Amino acid sequence: MAKLLIMSIVSFCFIFLLLLFFRYILKRYFNYMLNYKVWYLTLLAGLIPFIPIKFSLFKFNNVNNQAPTVESKSHDLNHNINTTKPIQEFATDIHKFNWDSIDNISTVIWIVLVIILSFKFLKALLYLKYLKKQSLYLNENEKNKIDTILFNHQYKKNIVIRKAETIQSPITFWYGKYIILIPSSYFKSVIDKRLKYIILHEYAHAKNRDTLHLIIFNIFSIIMSYNPLVHIVKRKIIHDNEVEADRFVLNNINKNEFKTYAESIMDSVLNVPFFNKNILSHSFNGKKSLLKRRLINIKEANLKKQSKLILIFICIFTFLLMVIQSQFLMGQSITDYNYKKPLHNDYQILDKSKIFGSNSGSFVMYSMKKDKYYIYNEKESRKRYSPNSTYKIYLAMFGLDRHIINDENSRMSWNHKHYPFDAWNKEQDLNTAMQNSVNWYFERISDQIPKNYTATQLKQLNYGNKNLGSYKSYWMEDSLKISNLEQVIVFKNMMEQNNHFSKKAKNQLSSSLLIKKNEKYELYGKTGTGIVNGKYNNGWFVGYVITNHDKYYFATHLSDGKPSGKNAELISEKILKEMGVLNGQ
């Protein structure tokens, strides 16, 4: 949550500063006043990080929902060797900045702010209801004055003008209709010319729907109360409303009255105590802080009709920039966290919830013979996670391709640094390093591979989000992410279709991945476990099975429950047995 709030503030700030720049340029060099509605773009920018990017579910051909059993014949694999490597857990705890506590604190603060501001909003709304209820209808003489002032304007039915005894300054608000309230004393004590200015000014607020937009913006400011800039923008909207209402008055009076109108504003602001403390209405006297700007705008007023093309261009340009920068801030959010491409093969839905039990995750298997996928929890299988130690499959292949290691010599000497597992504290070759998931072995390979080479290979393989980050242990709960479905697709394509890597390198890699071998099948695979700040949060088992009649690529991922590589391997074997892939156990 904290990350989303930060991204929202940054996104909001970027568009806010951009609009300020546009306003400055247009005002200084073109005497053009941007409409206050452009500030809605800042709200949209602030909300984008919270909008879940959802695409329609991909439809596959010939989808079958029946639970399958894969046919298995008892032909001999022509192997007389029985091999079983024990399941072991070799995972280290990764210490990262703990966002959980920050998330909890920021969420609590946000909720408190929302409650406080919601109460303030409700209180303001109830006060408007009170003002409406205690307002009085105008008498005939007062109606005639209003009709004379607004003679050249279409008096809309949704605009109501009334008087009130309890207010000191004219105000305009929306409560089902646009209501303009004039202090009762004004019809007696204020000269007709000054009353005309006041009525025109308040009528402009109602005509432009300023008060309705003020309510809408206040609602958004409650939702985005975590962002201090939203309150600055709200003040700017109120200021823009007043300036726009002043322009409306100037357009409806003679030029020789401009000075008198300015004096009326000064007299009202300086001599009448500031009345309007309601956040949902506009008051004629306004705040003293706005007086200088209003007077300058009256003096420099450009009363020519302003082109809407400039406004449209700025809105479109800003919107495009907003989309681009939001994707940058979200770290390629569309591609980082979900695999979106449709499968062009048949696939079959599985129900393996009983085997998964309390574990949350997914299972994907591909049959080479049938050219068909078998998927449990398709939605989850498209979510991307850190590959952790399953990425060592690719580091090994890259190391073989770059001749950092080879089939004749894949040994690396131990640097005598003490590691958490005894199996790591010795000389390693590819087989032992893969079996014991020795971090230092594969980190040493990675350190000798240029970043541009890795980036090229990941692009060719279409490996997950291809994000190498700082290029330091990027596969261990860091920038690189891949989905369970992609694990199967990428691994299968690399071993079966990729011509860049030699057959010799593929055979050596396979040898290091061998787990079980008997007369019925050969099981190859690699586990992966993600532990962050002592918490297990990611478990993988990726591999393939060779039987007498077929070859199957598979991957199991666990995201909750008991998410470890060891548990993922146990679940995988149960599913493969149930489906008949590991027949004859």
Swiss-Prot record:
<feature type="active site" description="Acyl-ester intermediate">
    <location>
        <position position="389"/>
    </location>
</feature>
<feature type="region of interest" description="Beta-lactam antibiotic sensor domain">
    <location>
        <begin position="331"/>
        <end position="585"/>
    </location>
</feature>
<dbReference type="GO" id="GO:0008658">
    <property type="term" value="F:penicillin binding"/>
</dbReference>
<dbReference type="GO" id="GO:0005886">
    <property type="term" value="C:plasma membrane"/>
</dbReference>
<feature type="topological domain" description="Extracellular">
    <location>
        <begin position="49"/>
        <end position="104"/>
    </location>
</feature>
<keyword id="KW-1133">Transmembrane helix</keyword>
<feature type="topological domain" description="Cytoplasmic">
    <location>
        <begin position="23"/>
        <end position="31"/>
    </location>
</feature>
<feature type="transmembrane region" description="Helical">
    <location>
        <begin position="105"/>
        <end position="122"/>
    </location>
</feature>
<feature type="topological domain" description="Cytoplasmic">
    <location>
        <begin position="123"/>
        <end position="311"/>
    </location>
</feature>
<dbReference type="InterPro" id="IPR001460">
    <property type="entry name" value="PCN-bd_Tpept"/>
</dbReference>
<keyword id="KW-0812">Transmembrane</keyword>
<feature type="transmembrane region" description="Helical">
    <location>
        <begin position="312"/>
        <end position="328"/>
    </location>
</feature>
<comment type="function">
    <text>Integral membrane protein involved in sensing of the presence of beta-lactam antibiotics and transduction of the information to the cytoplasm. Mechanistically, activation of the signal transducer involves acylation of a serine in the C-terminal sensor domain upon binding of the beta-lactam antibiotic. In turn, a conformational change occurs and the signal is transmitted from the cell surface to the cytoplasm.</text>
</comment>
<feature type="transmembrane region" description="Helical">
    <location>
        <begin position="5"/>
        <end position="22"/>
    </location>
</feature>
<keyword id="KW-0472">Membrane</keyword>
<keyword id="KW-0814">Transposable element</keyword>
<dbReference type="InterPro" id="IPR052173">
    <property type="entry name" value="Beta-lactam_resp_regulator"/>
</dbReference>
<dbReference type="Pfam" id="PF00905">
    <property type="entry name" value="Transpeptidase"/>
</dbReference>
<dbReference type="InterPro" id="IPR012338">
    <property type="entry name" value="Beta-lactam/transpept-like"/>
</dbReference>
<dbReference type="Pfam" id="PF05569">
    <property type="entry name" value="Peptidase_M56"/>
</dbReference>
<comment type="similarity">
    <text>Belongs to the peptidase M56 family.</text>
</comment>
<keyword id="KW-1003">Cell membrane</keyword>
<protein>
    <recommendedName>
        <fullName>Regulatory protein BlaR1</fullName>
    </recommendedName>
</protein>
<dbReference type="InterPro" id="IPR008756">
    <property type="entry name" value="Peptidase_M56"/>
</dbReference>
<feature type="topological domain" description="Extracellular">
    <location>
        <begin position="329"/>
        <end position="585"/>
    </location>
</feature>
<feature type="modified residue" description="N6-carboxylysine">
    <location>
        <position position="392"/>
    </location>
</feature>
<feature type="transmembrane region" description="Helical">
    <location>
        <begin position="32"/>
        <end position="48"/>
    </location>
</feature>
<feature type="topological domain" description="Extracellular">
    <location>
        <begin position="1"/>
        <end position="4"/>
    </location>
</feature>
